[in-house]
Design a protein with these regions (language model features):
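Aromatic "clamp/platform" in nucleotide-sugar-dependent glycosyltransferases that forms part
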Residues: 26, 45
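Nucleotide-activated donor-binding/catalytic signature segment of Leloir-type glycosyltransferases, i.e.
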Residues: 9-25
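A charged, aromatic-enriched C-terminal amphipathic alpha-helix characteristic of glycosyltransferases
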Residues: 102-138
């Protein structure tokens, strides 16, 4: 959500896509929404490390994003494209991501990919506890 939402909603309506595009606003049930998706598209202009991309992959979704997104977002299956790439090529990459997601069984691998990439709360808590212990013993 943001100040551009009404304009984007207008564009969607003008193009006859209102029955295919949902604007859901702020949600507390994002994990359930990820389970209803087949892949995640993130064509962002300005991003550092978008946690939404990490979360989507944790849910086992293949990710297609712009090259403006940092490489660190990739914990498994991410494709990066320049924003200047044609809509046809973006659509092709989305199609490829959907196929890869099915072929690799990403849903079942999401939790392991998360842990391997270091986005695991238990691992991070242990690491922080060890650092504090080392400081206390210093």
């Amino acid at each position: 959500d943001g100040p551009l939402r009404p304009g984007v909603e207008g564009i969607v309506a003008e193009r006859g896509l209102a029955d295919r595009v949902l604007f859901l606003g702020d949600r507390k049930d994002v994990a359930a929404l990820y389970q209803a998706m087949d892949m995640f598209l993130l064509p962002s202009l300005y991003e550092g490390l978008p946690m939404v991309g990490v979360e989507a992959q944790c849910a086992g979704l293949p990710l297609v994003c712009s090259k403006e997104v940092t490489d660190e977002v990739s914990i498994g299956e991410a494709t990066f494209l320049p924003l200047e790439t044609s809509a046809r090529q973006w659509a092709h990459q989305v199609s490829q991501a959907l196929e890869r997601g099915r072929d690799l069984g990403l849903r079942a691998q999401g939790e392991e990919m998360t842990r391997t990439a270091g986005f695991d709360i238990t691992h991070e808590a242990d690491r922080l506890a060890h650092r504090y212990q080392a400081l206390a013993e210093w």
